[in-house]
Amino acid sequence: MAANPNETTQTDAPNLSAVADVLDKDSQETREWMDALSAVIESEGPERAHFLLEQLLEHARQKSIDMPFSANTGYVNTIEADQQERCPGNIQIEKRLRSYMRWNAMAMVVKANRLHPADGGDLGGHIGSFASLASLFGAGFNHFWHAESENHGGDCLYIQGHSSPGIYARAYLEGRLTEEQLLNFRQEVGGKGLSSYPHPKLMPEFWQFSTVSMGLGPLMAIYQARFLKYLHARGIANTENRKVWVFCGDGEMDEVESLGAIGLAARENLDNLVFVINCNLQRLDGPVRGNGKIIQELESEFRGSGWNVIKLLWGSSWDSLLARDKEGILRKIMMDTNDGDYQSFKANDGAYVRKNFFGRDPRTLEMVAKMSDDDIWNLRRGGHDSEKVYAAFHSAVNHKGQPSVLLIKTVKGFGMGKIGEGKNNVHQTKKLGDEDIKLFRDRFNIPIPDSQLADIPFYKPADDTPEMKYLHERRKALGGYLPERRTKADESFTVPSLETFKAVLEPTAEGREISTTQAYVRFLTQLLRDQALGPRVVPILVDEARTFGMEGLFRQIGIYNPAGQQYTPVDKDQVMYYKEDKKGQILQEGINEAGGMCSWIAAATSYSTNNRIMIPFYVYYSMFGFQRFGDLAWAAGDMLARGFLLGGTSGRTTLNGEGLQHEDGHSHIMASTIPNCVSYDPTFAHEVGVILHHGLKRMVEKQENVYFYITLLNENYAMPGLKAGTEEQIIKGMYLCKEGSKLTPRVQLLGSGTILRESIAAQELLEKEWGVAANVWSCPSFNELARDGQNTERWNLLHPAEAPRLSFVGEQLEKHTGPVVASTDYMKAFAEQIRSFIPKGRTYKVLGTDGFGRSDFRSKLREHFEVNRHYIVVAALKALSEEGAIPVAKVADVSLVKD
C-alpha cells in the first residue's frame, strides 16, 4: 500500500514517547524502535517506512496478535507546514475582497430583517455560515473552480445552503446581481428578489443544484460525480477534467443521507469528487459533539470507507508553536480538548484561552509566556488561513484514485464579535445593532464613514481598482463566472413517430395476455434501438430487473461498472446473463432507492449540467418511491429535472401476498404535490405507449421542464389496442374507452389502473342484471384532470365578465347523462380531486383503497377494500336512487355493505 504523501512525518517529530502509555515496561526498547523508524524515514523515505509498518502488522496478525485498528491521525493538519503548496494569488487583495463580501452578505441579511410588514414577521437569513466559509469560497473561486468554457465542461458546485448570502455578495461585486436584487433578498414575489437558498426553479440561470433540505447535497453530489464518469466511459461527453465540489456542515453530516453513499464513491474511485466539510463545531442549537470531536469522528468514517482525508485544523500562526512542541505536549492537549471547550475558547478571549487551554500543562503555558492575550486570541483555525486553505484544495484536486474529503476547522460567525462569534445562537442571529455593525466594519476595514453606517450601505469598489480587476481576472482565467446554470441544451433531437412503437399500441393476439410493465419494457427496447436516442437512454434499476422482466437488457446493453467484469458470472451460459461492462448503459444501484433517485436526478438534469440530453428511466416498487425518497423528488422538481419515474407493482390490491409495506395506494397523491411532476396511472398497453411517447416529445424534443411518473402493473390481461383519435384525451387524462348501450337509466363509470377493469366488469353486470346502461371512462390521470380543473376555475375567477370555461372533465361528461362513479386502486382522495368539476346536479361517488394494505389474493383484497365490480354496482345503483332514477328498495336488494 503506497504511502499518502500528505501524511509524511518530519525527522524532527515530537518525542511521542513522552506522552506514551504509562504502562510501557521497557522504554529503552520503545525508544530503539522509534529511532529505527525515524532512521528509515530519513534515509529511505516515508514510502519505505509505510511498507515496513504494513509488513510488521501483517506478521503480527499471522501470529494471532489482536491488532486494534484506528482510522484516526493526530489532531493536527494533514499537510505539514514545509510541504504545503504555495498560493500563487495576491493574498492581500483576496483578503480585501473577502472583507467586502462579508460586509455585503451581512448587510443583505440585516437590511432584510429591518423591514416591518403590516402582517409582522421577519424574512430570516443567516450571517454566521458564510462568515465561517468565506476563506474556503475565496480559494475556490479565485484558483480552482472552472466555469463551463470551450475547453472545460465546468465544475459542479454544491453550495452549503445557509451560506447563500455570501454567494450573492460575490455575484454583486462581479456585476452579475444588482443592488436592487440584494435589497430584495428573500422577497421573490415581485420578480426582482433572491431566493433564500440555492433553488434552480427560482433562479434558473444562477443556481445549478438544490442543496436544501440538508443531507441531500452530499448524496446527490456523489451520484453526480459517478454520472460524469459514466458519461465519459460511454463516450457521450469528455468529463475527465471536471470536479464535483460539495460544501456541507459538520452538523449536516448527521443526516443519514450525508454519509449514506460514501462507500460507493470510494468503491468507484471517484477522484473527481471533493467534499469540503465546514467544521465550525456548531449546529443550530449547540455543539455538534460537545463531549467529543466531530472532526476525528468524520475522519474515521471517511478514511475507513476508503477516502483520501485531508484535515486542516490550525492556521499558520500555530506553526511555530507546533515546531517547538518536541515532547508532543501541545499535540496531546489539542487531542484531549473536546469540541465543547473549543467552542468556548472562541466565545471568550485570549486570557480565557491562555488559562483553560495552554494552562493545562506548565510546559505549554511556558510556550506562550511571551505572547500577549491578543496574540493568543489571534491563533486562528485553519479554515481562516487562505494560504493553508489553498494548499488543502491543491492537494485534493491533484489526488488520484480516491475521492477526497477536506475536514476544515472554522469558527461559526467569524468576525461577528460578541454578538455571534462562537455563540450557540449565532445561526439565528440576523439582526445587528449599530455598535455591532460599527465593530464589524472596523474589523474588516470597510471604507464606509460613520455618517452612513445607519443605512448599512452595500460596498462595491470602482471598476478600475486593483481589487475589481483582480476579481474579474481570476474568473476569466477559470473560464467565467459561477454559479451559472444552463437552461437548455445546445443539441436537439426529433422523437420518432408514435407508429414506431406499434408493438405496444396494437391489440394483443387472441389468447395472449401481458401486463403494462411488459408494455413498458417493449417500448424501452424499441427506443434503445433508435440510433439517435438509444444511446441517451439511462435505465436505472434498484435490484428489481427480474421483478419487472427487464433482465433481457443485461446482455443487450450491459450494466455499467468502471472495473468491468473481473469474474465469470454464474449464468454466463445463458442468453440473458448478468453482464457488467466498463461501457455498460444500465445503472444498477442495488437495494438503494435513494441512490437510484440520485442517479436519476443526475441524468435528468444532464441537459443543464453537461449540455447533453439524457433520458433516464428509473423503475422501482411504487411503494418505495415518493414515500421513501420524497425529499429528493421535490428537489428534482426544484432542479427542473426531465425524465421518467416508473412505479412498478402499483396499486393497493395488485401485488399478491406482499402486504402492508408493499401495497401502494397513495403514490399518485404524493406525486400530485410536485407541480412539475406529470403523473399517470394507465390500464392498457396503448396508454403506456402514448404517455411515454408524449413524455419524450415534451422533455426531449421541446425541452420542457417537467418529469413524468407512470405507475405500472404486474397483472396480465388482454390489451384492446389504441383507438384512433383518443391520443390527446389519454394525455389530458380521460377518454371514453367502452360505451354502453342506449338503455336508461344511465351511469358513467370512471376508473384507472387495474380497477378500470372492475368498472368494465361492473358495466356488464349493471346492464344484464339491473337494466342500467353504463359508459366506462378510462382516466389515466386524475392528477392532470384536477390540475386542468383548477386552472379552469382560476381563469373563470379572474375573468368574471367573460363566458366561463369548462374543465376537461366537464367537457367529457356534459353530453353523457347520469351519476358518476369513480373507482381506483388508490385512496379515495385521488379521485376526489375532480369532484368540483363534475357537471352540476350530478351525483359523484368515489371508491378507493383507504387504509393499510395486507396480504392475500387480488380478488379478496378488492373485496376487502370495496373496490371490486360488485361494490361499483352498489355505488352506481345508490347514486341512481339518490337522483330518483330507481327506487331505494332496488339498491337494498343488492347492497353488500358490511356491519
Which residues make up each language-model segment?
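N-terminal amphipathic, basic-rich helices that act as targeting or association modules
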Residues: A2-E174, F440, I514-D530, G534, ...
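Glycine- and acidic
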Residues: V19, A36-A39, R86-E94, N113-G125, ...
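Cofactor-binding active-site loop characterized by glycine-rich and histidine/acidic residues
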Residues: G89, I93-M101, A105-A118, H126-E268, ...
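Short alpha-helical segments and helix-capping/turn motifs at coil-helix boundaries
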Residues: D119-L123, S135-W145, E150-G154, E205-F209, ...
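Residue-level marker for buried hydrophobic side chains located in beta-strands
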Residues: V246-F247, F275, I540, L646, ...
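A structural-propensity feature for long, helix-poor, extended segments
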Residues: V246-F247, M253, D631-R652, G657
